[in-house]
Amino acid sequence: MTKQECAIKYITENYLNFNRLRHDVIADKLQIRIADSLENASLQNTPMGLQFSDEDTWREMTKHDINSIVCHAAQEYDANITSREVITALQSDLIPDVHPLREYVLSCHTWTEDQPDWIDFVARQVHVVDASNIDRTRGAVDRAEPCRSASPEDRPTGCSVSRKSTASITSDLKCSASETNYSEPRERSKADALWRICFKKWFVAMVASWMNDEVVNHQVLVLIGRQGIFKTTWLEHLIPPHLRAYACKLANSNDLNKDERLRIAEFGLISLDEIDSMNNRELNQLKSVITATDVNERAAYAYTKERRVRLASFCASGNRRDFLTDITGNRRWLPFEVESIQNPFFTTLPYNRMYAQAWALAQDPLFSYWFDLDEIEVLEQHNQHFRDETNEEQLLPILFDVPAEGKGEFMTTAQISERLVTYGNIKKPMALSRLGMVLGAAGYQSTRPKIGGQLIRGWLVYQRDTDEIASLKRLLKE
C-alpha cells in the first residue's frame, strides 16, 4: 500500500468505523469524539479500548490529535507516513459532514398540537412591564407565581397551544385573559401578551433559520432592565448546554469588521450586550447585518472569498430603555422592559420539547413566524416607548401644533429648525431632512407654495404664543 492508502485505512478502521470523526459544516472544522470517562469505558471490541455512548462529547480536532494519528498509523503499518497524507485524508469527503444544530433539532421528540405549549412555558419565566405604564410607574405588572423546573414529570398544565393564539399578535391582544387557552396566576397585560407572542415567533423563526437556508430571522429580541436580573444569562440559556459553542456575543464597535460579519454564518445565536450604548451609526450598521441573507468574505487562512449562508438569529440586552433612534420605523426590534426573570441557574429548561415544538410550528402552514402588516403596526406603536427622542422632537409639540384644516402658517423646515434650536439652545441640531421626517410623522402637512416666482417646500404649522407655551410647561411639570 502507498503511504496515502495506509493513512486512509488507519483513519477508517480506527475512527470512521466507530463514528469518531466528523466535519462540522457550521464552524468548518474537524471534530473528534472522546469518551467522557476513560476509567469506566468498556474495553470490548472498540479501538483503543473505548466504548462510546450518546453522552460522549465532540471537540475540535487539534494538531496534537493529527500528530497522534500520524504516529500510530506509521507504527501500525511500518511506513513513513507524514502529516501530509493524514491531513489530505481528513480534508476529503471521507469525513462525514454534520450540521450540529440541525442534528439536534431532528433528534428531539415529535411535538403535536394537543401537547403542552413549552415555548410559552419558557416565555412566562420573564415578567415584563406594561409599555403603556412605563413612563408613569415602574413595576406596573404584578409578579407571576414562580415557574417550576420543566421535566417530563413536571409539565405545565392548561397551557396547550392553539393556532389562533400564536398566529397573530393583533387577534391575541383583542382577547381577554378569560378567552385564552392559558391558565395563569395573574391577569395578562397587553405587554405580557405581546411578549409571549413575539418570543414564540422569534424562537420559531430562529429554529426555522437553522433548518432552512432560505429562512432568515429578521427580528431582534431585546430585554431591557436593571442590572443583575439575568437578562443576558436567560437569553444565553435558550441554547442547550452542549450547543453553546454555536452562540456568541458581539461587542459594540464603530465598525463591523470582516470577522464580526462572518459570525452570522458561524453561529446560531448572536447576543448583543449593552445594546443601549450603541450610537445611531452602529445601529444602522447592525441593521444591515440583521437583514443580510449571506456573507461573502475570506475567512482566516482561506485562499479566496466564499459565500456562506446566514445562520444566526440576534438577541440583545441593555439597561436604558430609549435606545431606538430610527425615525422612519423600528420593526426589526422586539424590545421589552423586564421587571424580573426567574433565575436560569435554578431552572431546567425543557430543551428537547421546546425545540421539537418550534420545529413543528415552523413546518405548520397555519402558523406564521413572521410579522404581517397589522402586527408590524402593533409593534411600531409598542416600540415608540423605546425610542430616543431628539431635542427637536421633544420641543416640537410645545412650540408648534398641527393647524386646523385650511389654516396654518407656512414655514420652511429651516425656519422651524431655527426656532426649535434657538428656544432649546440646541448645540447640535438634527439634519433638516431628518426634521422633515419628524414633521411628517407628527401629522404636519407638507406644501409647496410659489413665493417670489419660485416653488418653496415647507409646512403648514400653528405657532403657539407665549401664554400657551407657559401653560403647557406647567402641565408637563405636574
Give the predicted meaning of each segment.
Residues L283-E306:
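Conserved catalytic/switch belt of AAA+ P-loop NTPases
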Residues E260-A265, A299-S317:
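AAA+/SF3 P-loop NTPase mechanochemical coupling elements
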Residues T347-N383:
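Long, low-complexity, charged/polar intrinsically disordered regions in eukaryotic proteins
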Residues S132-D142, P146, E153-D154, S168, ...:
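DNA transaction DNA-binding modules
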Residues L324-N343:
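A short helix-turn-beta junction within AAA+ P-loop NTPase domains corresponding to the substrate/partner-engaging
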Residues S92-V141, A177-A265:
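P-loop NTPase catalytic core of nucleic-acid-dependent motor ATPases
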Residues M1-N133, S176, A193, I197, ...:
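N-terminal nucleic-acid engagement/recognition segments and initiation subdomains in replication
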Residues F267-T291, L324-G329:
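Conserved AAA+/SF3 P-loop NTPase catalytic/coupling segment centered on the Walker-B
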